[in-house]
Amino acid sequence: MRLSTMLELAVERDPRAIAIVDGDRRWSYADWYARVEQLARALRASGVGPGDRVVLCLRNREETAALHLACQRVDAITTPLNFRLASGEIAYCIGDAAPRLVVYEDCTAQAVLAGRAQWGCRPELVAVDAPVPPGGIAFDALLARGDSAPSLPPIPADADDRLIGLILYTSGTTGRPKGVPRSQRAEYAAAVAHALQNRY
């Protein structure tokens, strides 16, 4: 099973229940599912597909969670980076991941953009509540790409959950950070274990 399937099941169970709260912003499961689906269509319209990496230089916020589920929906690979990393560390990880998109916010903009010359790749830049550089777009503009994009097919019951859904970079204590892949199945199991442990 996949995390994105869990969201679909939550919508079926109680669509009006609150799914996520970020400051003064709230979404019901039904509303958030629609937003994640729109974002998944937007990713597909942006050329993001199976196996593509999407680097997130974001704090814990709604956009982070929505992007993670949207990436899984199109079989792309979420690659979150610690927002406290220095510019050189971020540049190395982006160069190593070779992502299709790099998503950042105001608190990470300087560190992300300062190392662009070192990346060795040219991902599209997506700014969340941050200045948009030449050639980049705002998150809301990315989301709007999903408005007219075709609907995605339902996730088949036998969808391969062994696909890589996440790459986490190690701290690099013995050298350069290394990208550690995690399958969609492992992410689902971790979410279930977390829910059981914390009695959600």
Regions found by a protein language model. Give the residues of each.
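Conserved structural elements of the adenylate-forming
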Residues: Y33-Q38, V180-Y200
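Structural core segment of the AMP-binding/adenylate-forming
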Residues: A45-S46, R73-A144
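Conserved AMP-binding/adenylate-forming core of the ANL superfamily
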Residues: L3, E8, R16-R61, A65-L69, ...
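Short hydrophobic alpha-helical segments of the AMP-binding
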Residues: T64-Q72, T78, E187
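Conserved pre-ATP/AMP-binding loop-to-beta segment of ANL
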Residues: P15, V132, D147-Y169, R176, ...
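Conserved AMP-binding A3 loop
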Residues: S28-A30, G165-A189
